[in-house]
UniProtKB/Swiss-Prot annotation:
It is found in: Secreted. It comes from the Eukaryota. N-glycosylated. Expressed by the venom gland. It comes from Vipera ammodytes ammodytes (Western sand viper). Belongs to the snaclec family. GO terms for cellular component: extracellular region. The gene is LC1. This is Snaclec factor X-activator 1 light chain 1. Residues 11-13 form the C-type lectin domain.
Amino acid sequence: DFDCPXDWVXYDQ
């Protein structure tokens, strides 16, 4: 689920 303004900003891994 890529619901972030980018392609990593949402990733908290």
